[in-house]
Amino acid sequence: MNPEELLDALDPDQRAVATQVAGPLAVLAGAGTGKTRAITYRIAYGAAVGAVDPSNVLAVTFTQRAAFEMRHRLAQLGVPKAQARTFHSAALRQLRHFWPTVVGGPLPDVIPHKASLVAASAARLGIAIDRTNVRDIAAEVEWAKVSMIDAAHYAASVARLRRDVPAGLDAGDMARLLDVYEDAKNERGVIDFEDILIYLCGMLQERADVASIVRKQYRSFVVDEFQDVNLLQARLLDLWLGGRHDVCVVGDVAQTIYSFTGASPDYLTGFGRKHPGARVVELTRDYRSTPQIVTLANDVLARATQREGTVRLSSQRDGGAHVGYCTYDDDHAEAAGVAAQIADLVAGGVQPHNIAVLMRTNGQSQAFEEALGHRGIPVAVAGGKPFFARDDVRTAISRLRAAAAAAQEGALGELVRDVLSGVGWAPDAPSGQAGSERWSNMNAIVGWADDSHADTLAAFVAELDERIAYQVEPDKAGVELATIHAAKGLEWDAVFLVGLSEGLLPISYAKTPEAREEERRLLYVAVTRARDLLTLSWARSRGADGRGKRKRSRLLDGIWPQERGVGAPKKKVRASTRALNHAFEEEASPQAIDLFARLKAWRLAVSRQAGVPPFAVFTDQTLRDIAVAMPKNTTQLRVIRGIGDVKVQRFAAPVLALVRGEEVVVDEEA
């Protein structure tokens, strides 16, 4: 793409990010404002105008999935050479390269978990701990190491920070355990994940030759989710830069929810002090959520006592349904009520995987899983065998690899379908339970093929290999039950935020003002996961007999409307789609209303021709967004949520014709 085409796909603020091709630059990006789009286009634009060599760019993300997504987007924009990795992935790659020269021999194995070493260390000290305590102590070891606090300074540090020592230990015991843990690790000849960063920092600091090679390779840096950076990661970034300032950081102070792991927003808010002359760009246009949801998010944030570096969102969506507020008698009633509302949504055409139930702790999920199961609604359960480790998936990829080696020719989607038809895929899902999981696994691969830009089967297999390397699995098929922490970075059409009572949100152990502010930010993160529908709920007691009386969360004081009684507003939920369309008709222009009606008529004809429900062509929300945006070309059409490459290929011509006011005829008998 040429530079002008790249900029045409961005809003003014995103364009300001993209055209600032040299750092230092701080991007304060609110939820749903397109930060990933802005920074990937910045790299692509810099390459297009010759300001940067993509092979000298390192984009740092916080999850493997985010790194995969960024690499995929950059490849689509014609920039396949830019590196996108997590801190640990980038550091491990460099450490493996330099270790034989600097230290000698191969890099020690990296232990995937600390549990066995922590348990052995505690036993050596005569400290009795159970499985839960092992997990908590392992987390404390990680916190100390990323905070660069050694055993000698641990007790003073936790006292200064008013940090609770886990597992009922005193600070002295925990300090001794830190020492013994390091000894046990060294005796086994292994390293942990924190050591990857620690050892690389040591190399870069002590070996000028190593630092010179790394800095020559990477001259421009982009760091996403910068509000979640800890001291060790900030130190590594400084050493990568080596006094240079060509760095772009992106983050949202309001989404700082990992301070208990050592993360701090201070690196984002203090970026200008560290890099004098740094430019700051705010992304405030929210393309994800309706105005009603964005208003609630802004209200939550407005009550925070720490707002430095936060932004106020402005929804770019048309009016939607009102946020729902439900009060229930007890936990069982809450789970049943939420399940009833979800059943209504599913009956109305919303796919289960587009719905989430978010909660503060994992322990809250069982009641909702049972209530949804009672109604026959599939649930996405955490855990289970990894997708790429499943036998049928491994067989499918082996078949595809063999077909690619044989250089079979044809349209990619047809080739993949043909190969996978021999291992359980068919155009229609099996009616019974038998074979349904295998079919779902195969269909996920077919879906990837449909969305792929690969020209050949070999190129598609290479994409699958990259997914395997990054462990990027398909989206789960059922209603997502997730903690708010796990939901960060994700979004759904409909979100139910449950258990909003004192002791849960804010959590009972959030005793300091700083900890309670982090609970408020958790609420903000949860609210901003919703695109179209959001319902908040809490229960007055734990059990039906009234035991375990509760109070509604203080975080909702001044926000929760006057009590609406007990139970789920089922009628209101059933009317949610009508409410969205009614709000659109009240607020949109006459031209947009007319275009929306013509788009719906066209969609109905297309769905009948294809034998699929209308929402499988485009959702009402996507049609509303088209009607308001009135895109003039495929580039502008592609920006609209819900329109990927496959739908652009299939429907761009008739949709753009309808936008131009032309008549489009669909032969429903074809």
What kind of feature is each model-predicted range?
Residues 8-19, 23-31, 38, 58-59, ...:
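Conserved helicase NTPase motor core
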Residues 3-10, 15-19, 23-31, 55, ...:
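Inter-lobe coupling/hinge region of RecA-like P-loop helicase motors
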Residues 2, 6, 45, 231-328:
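Conserved RecA-like helicase ATPase core segment
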Residues 537-670:
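Accessory DNA-binding and partner-docking regions appended to nucleic-acid-acting proteins
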